[in-house]
Amino acid sequence: MAFSRLIPATAVGLVLALVRPVAGRSGISGGPRGAPVRAASCAADLDCSLNGVCVGGACRCDPPWTGPVCGVLSYKTTPASGRSLYPESDPRNTWNGAIIRGIDGLYHLFNPIYKPGTLGGTSTMLHGTAASVTGPYQWNTRPNITISEIGAFDGPKSVVYTDPETNSTKYTLWLGGGVYIADSLDGPFTRLEGFKYPGANPAPLWHQGAFYANYGTTIYTTPRLVSGARWTEHGAVSHEGVPANWLPEDPDMWMDKRNNWHIINHAYDNYEWQHCATSVLSSHFFSQDGKTWHFLPQAVQPYSHTVQYDDGTTHMFVTLERPNMFFDETGLLTHIHLAADLVTGDEGCGNRTNHSHYGHVPCDNCKYEDHGGTTIIALGL
């Protein structure tokens, strides 16, 4: 999706963003749809994060992107059901999953379930369905899916693609180092034996008949999902300009309507343990060919901590990780769904002892002792 992730696993995608004050810069809010936002000098579309075009020296952003350099995802009020897509009354943890819109018109969420106090080590993936991407999801209408045990932070992501030999639609879930394939969202999902993707925590993409994945700072490609498939290097993601102490992880990769490539990440700073509402949260890299990648010196963060809901409440998430963009069936980016710490707020958890760095537990590590969940945010269009 991205029209090429093609509907990465769903025919859907999503996004969001924020400009964090860095080195004396102040946050900037978005303007009218499709209109330049505040005077900002640009000479080329690259200066607009490839999320818009440079017109008359100013960036004209594609919704839901906004800001002077089109680097921030605009949020809108999200249905309250989106705060936690799996019931918070269950003490077990989820940590985001894959959402795919089916031909039945339902949204299918595939989410591994972890024991209380853990974010890894399971062989059970739940299958929930909803009439709206923001839920509420029903978790008792589809059987659980048995998977090979996965560790922490290794999927699932999804890709929907067309098999060139049969011209049939294939649904795939990427997790635990392997790929599970089905002809229907109701399964059965069968692991492709003898196939592995590079590294862990995949960011798969299907484009022009080939598969791509991001691991670390490398983009890999393979022509087919077959046993014994070999991955070759396609490009390198430069981290030049990324501020000191920023650590990008959890990539999600897609292509936009202009065939530009994008990667959005959760990012964090292990020195930040107070005032978590302004802590580092996300990053964005972009490319015109998937080989040469860019990061703007403004250090714009695409998504932010605080979400407003239609029941009048607001929630500040201490961390939002494992971002997945959700695109609708027309290829429009409408939502972003993420793994979320559902408990701790701006106060952080610096005085805890487990998972500490430099004498304190940083904002993003509160999750290890809190309730982990899956949340979704509606983007402004």
Please report, for each region that a protein language model flagged, where it lies by residue:
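Carbohydrate-active catalytic/glycan-binding domains of CAZyme proteins
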Residues: R25-L381
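N-terminal secretory signal peptides that target proteins for export/translocation
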Residues: M1-F3
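Cleavable N-terminal signal peptides of Sec/SRP-targeted secreted and luminal proteins
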Residues: R5-P21
